[in-house]
Structure formats: structure tokens, C-alpha cells
Amino acid sequence: MAQISKCSSLSTELNESSIISHHHGNLWDDDFIQSLKSSNGAPQYHERAEKLVEEIKNLVVSEMKDCNDDLIRHLQMVDIFECLGIDRHFQNEIQVALDYVYRYWNELEGIGIGSRDSLIKDFNATALGFRALRLHRYNVSSDVLENFKNENGQFFCSSTVEEKEVRCMLTLFRASEISFPGEKVMDEAKAFTTEYLTKVLTGVDVTDVDQSLLREVKYALEFPWHCSLPRWEARNFIEICGQNDSWLKSIMNKRVLELAKLDFNILQCAHHRELQLLSRCWWSQSDIAQQNFYRKRHVEFYFWVVIGTFEPEFSTCRITFAKIATLMTILDDLYDTHGTLEQLKIFTEGVKRWDLSLVDSLPDYIKITFEFFLNTSNELIAEVAKTQERDMSAYIRKTWERYLEAYMQEAEWITAGHVPTFDEYMKNGISSSGMCILNLYSLLLMGQLLPDDVLEQIHSPSKIHELVELTARLVDDSKDFETNKVGGELASGIECYVKDNPECTLEDASNHLNGLLDLTVKELNWEFVRHDSVALCFKKFAFNVARGLRLIYKYRDGFDVSNQEMKTHIFKILIDPLT
């Protein structure tokens, strides 16, 4: 994103030979991508997976019949299916289990263990039930957690570290992450359990706690709900469960783990094919790939979408997302550092008119950029027309126009050395985040008709879309500040806030942005679970795009510097199979 500074480089004449890139190059050579081959996608593995699904369904029926009274067994089944990433195979079983639990849910006291009618309500069962029911959009109130506080207002907790209590605190921590704005008890639960679990990991007296449980605690603290995407969680939990000998004593658990590994590897093979198509047939054959001063991050952007939207039926959506995100990054680089203000005005006008001839007077590298933009956009507009059974080119072009106008505003601020107010910056920065255009193409190519009235509820100016845009802006600015402060540079949102509030330190401004981000997470939770006419797959997509940013920006800007944690993440999800 363009940085607010007194740099006037945009007013200087630029040509291709004078451009210097300050970013590392492409980490994913096409030859390497094309070399990704595995037998895990062979028919026999699909057949084995299908057989395991049927076996597990039969085991579920048998086990649920045997423990029909035990509500926590139903919840544990749902939780393990979801953590291991195989829940899509058992949607009916999950629905039946949660309906059954909800039937006996007490809004004031939660649920008990041992018997569905137990008068003694259980902390762990209630926290587990609350989380599962809320995530599946059942109406449950967080007030139920008040029932598990002592007379001093503290959550029940003994002075010794015991496995049962650690499990209970972990379950409460995970439940507290699915909070809505204004839920004080959820904030209290999160603060309490975070402190407790952190002490557990750093303590010495944990000999009575199973190592697999400690691994779960470590994962939960390092990758909270807002940055624990389905594929990422599945890979990590498969590894954790595979080391839990006591858990694997169960026949059903062995089958579940075998299916989880097979399913992960089968999907990874499908994702290899999509990556190969993206790399060979789109990126490597384009002239833009030879422009070495642009960031080349098509694999990183594919990772962003696949960790949240991984199912086979969304292949076109994933490839589209990676293409548009790559294109947006190239435009970001152009408007940020590689074009003069006059050149950018001409480029923007060319987009408004959708006319390649308007950029004839510009340097070759900008003409190549414009042609790449136009070709990619027109190709995807044609795809959208087929899927949505109507011409949406005018709507899409208008969205591109608004996006580039926001970039132009930033370019003008940079050239003038102007630092806007925080509100001005955020209003423009939300548009320049690119979420509007990025999500639009992807949502339209998810394979389902998206009528205009539903599109309005999931896309601009809907609340959920506004929150995704805000997340993108806040995450980017917060991490820019952390990354750049050592070198004396300021992330633009931080600088604007300090300008408006001279009494604030940079740390104060950073804390303010992080506070806004925490509130945004809670509002996104609410928008995700509330019932409306928007299909859940569309909500999940937008929700997971926002969560994906939190993972990718966890340590640093993972797109700008993708040769560290990001590279490791990509190998773990897209390259290395499970054994």
C-alpha cells in the first residue's frame, strides 16, 4: 500500500531502465511448480477415502446410539471432524448431533455430562457446546458462562495443574474467541484463560498433562481462531492427533485419522493441478512476468485463498482470486513507486474508458501492464457472464474505477507531501485495500447464481464486506508499523492518527488500531453467524479471506516478505504431503 511520506518520487520522470525493485523476486519457478507430482490423487486413494467415510458414518451411528445420553460425546465428534478438516463429509451427522445437543441446552446453565438431564452442569461440556452451537448459527447466549464463576467473579480454577482442568480452560479459551461486540463475559474468559494457559506452557509442574494436550494449547495460543484457517488447522491437528497414542487406541479414531490424512493429500493433489494451471497457462506466458521490478506473488495469493476455501467445487474461484490479487499487487507497485503522477492519471483514465489506445504515449512497461490488466479482466468478465447468466461488465468496471481512484488519491498525497486526517486516510484506505474488487470476482465465480439483491448483502456496501475491507487496512497498517519502526519509517495509518492526536505516542496509535481490529473481529463473528438470505458459502468465503490476512500478517507482511514464514507455510499446505 502506498506510504504517506514527503517523498516526491512520483513527480520525477521514470523509465524502465531507472526502476529499482526493493522486493525479493519470485520464489516459485514455473519448472518447480510443474514438477509437483504425487500419486495421492490416484483412483485407489479416492476409493479408500470413500470407503472410510462410509465406515465412519456407521461407527458414528453405533457410537451415538451407545452413548445417546452423553451430550459431550456428540460435541467431541463434531469438534474432531472439524479440527481434522473432514467435516464436509459428515454434514448430516454433525447436524443431527448439534440438533440433539441444542434440544437439551439450558440457556442459563448449559449442559451436563453423563446424562442429558444431569442437574450438575459441566464447565467443559458447556464451553464446548457453546462454541459448536454458536459457530453453527444456533441462538446461544454467552451469559451461560456466568454460571461458572465463583463468588469473587472468577472462573472456577484450582491451584494445581491437572489435565482435566487444562482441557477445560482450553475449551473455554476457544469458546471465548467466538465473541460478539459488548459481550463482557467473553472478554473476561479470554483474558483469564490466556493467562492460565500461558502459565501452563511456561510452568514446570505439567507432568500430569498429556503432551498432545500441551501441543493443542500451544497451537491455540499461537494461532487463535481469527487466524486458524481450515487447511492450516487440519494440517496441524492431524500431526497433533498422530502423536496421541491414547487417542489412537479407539478404532473409530484410527479410521478418522486415516481419512483426514488421505483427504488432505487428495485435496493437495488437486491444488497442485490448479497451481500448475495458474503458473504455466496464465502467469509464465504473459509479458508482465518479464517485468522484474514488480512483485510476483501468484503462489502466495493462491495460498491465501486455499487455506480457507479449499473444497474441490471452488476451483475456478481460487484461480480467479489468485489472478486478481496478483494483478492488484502489480497495480499497487505501479501506483506506489513505478509511475509518475501524470502517467498514473493517463492509466486511470484508460481504465475508466477501458481503452488500450489511451496509454500509447506511456513507456512500454506501463503499456504492458495495462494490456495485462485489460486481458485478465476481460477474460474473467466473460467467465462471470457464463456463471451468472448476465452481463456484469459495467458493474465490474465501475468497481475497478473506484479502486484505482483510491490509488490516485494516495499518489496525489505522496506527491504533495500531504498527511491526511486519520478519518480521511481510513476512508480512502479501505477502498485502496482492494477487497472490493478481489472479493467481487471470486464471489461471482463460486459456481452459484448470485442475484443482485443477495450481491448487495455480501458485497459493497454491505456490512460484512465493509468489515473485510477494514480488516485488510488495519492488518496492513499495524504490521507496517511493527516492521518499519526500527528503521524510523511510519506506517501511514499510524502517522495520520498521531497527527490528529499530538499527545499520542506511536505505541498509543498502534494500540488504537489494534483495538479497532479486535472490535472488527467481533463484528465479523456476528455477521458470519447471523441468519439472512445470503448463502453460507458466500459468507464463509468473505470471512475466511479476512482471517487469512491475520495468518499471513501474523509475523510480518507475508506478501511483501514471503521468503520466511510464508514460504514455510506454503510448503506445509501446498507442497509437502502428509505421511
UniProtKB/Swiss-Prot annotation:
User: Mind listing the UniProt keywords for this protein, alphabetically?
Assistant: Lyase, Magnesium, Metal-binding
* Cofactor(s) needed by this chain: Mg(2+); Mn(2+)
Q: What family does the entry list?
A: Belongs to the terpene synthase family. Tpsd subfamily.
Q: Please provide the record's free-text comment about the domains of this protein.
A: The Asp-Asp-Xaa-Xaa-Asp/Glu (DDXXD/E) motif is important for the catalytic activity, presumably through binding to Mg(2+).
Q: Which Pfam families does the UniProt entry name for this protein?
A: Terpene_synth (PF01397), Terpene_synth_C (PF03936)
Q: Which residues bind Mg(2+) 1?
A: 332, 336
Q: This chain belongs to which protein, by name?
A: Alpha-longipinene synthase
Q: Tell me which residues bind Mg(2+) 3.
A: 476, 484
What is the uppermost EC class here?
lyase
Functional pathway: Sesquiterpene biosynthesis; Terpene metabolism; oleoresin biosynthesis
Task: Give the cofactor binding note.
Answer: Binds 3 Mg(2+) or Mn(2+) ions per subunit.
Question: What InterPro entries does the database record attribute to this sequence?
Answer: Isoprenoid_synthase_dom_sf (IPR008949), Terpene_cyclase-like_1_C (IPR034741), Terpene_cyclase_plant_C1 (IPR044814), Terpene_synth_N (IPR001906), Terpene_synth_N_sf (IPR036965), Terpene_synthase-like (IPR050148), Terpene_synthase_metal-bd (IPR005630), Terpenoid_cyclase/PrenylTrfase (IPR008930)
Q: Where is this motif: DDXXD motif?
A: 332-336
Sum up the protein's function in the record's words.
Terpene synthase (TPS) involved in the biosynthesis of sesquiterpene natural products included in conifer oleoresin secretions and volatile emissions; these compounds contribute to biotic and abiotic stress defense against herbivores and pathogens. Catalyzes the conversion of (2E,6E)-farnesyl diphosphate (FPP) to alpha-longipinene.
From the broadest rank down, the organism's phylogenetic lineage runs: Eukaryota, Viridiplantae, Streptophyta, Embryophyta, Tracheophyta
Residues annotated as binding Mg(2+) 2 are 332, 336
EC no.? 4.2.3.80
- Reactions performed catalytically: (2E,6E)-farnesyl diphosphate = alpha-longipinene + diphosphate
What's an example Gene Ontology biological process for this entry? Answer: green leaf volatile biosynthetic process
GO MF = lyase activity; magnesium ion binding; terpene synthase activity
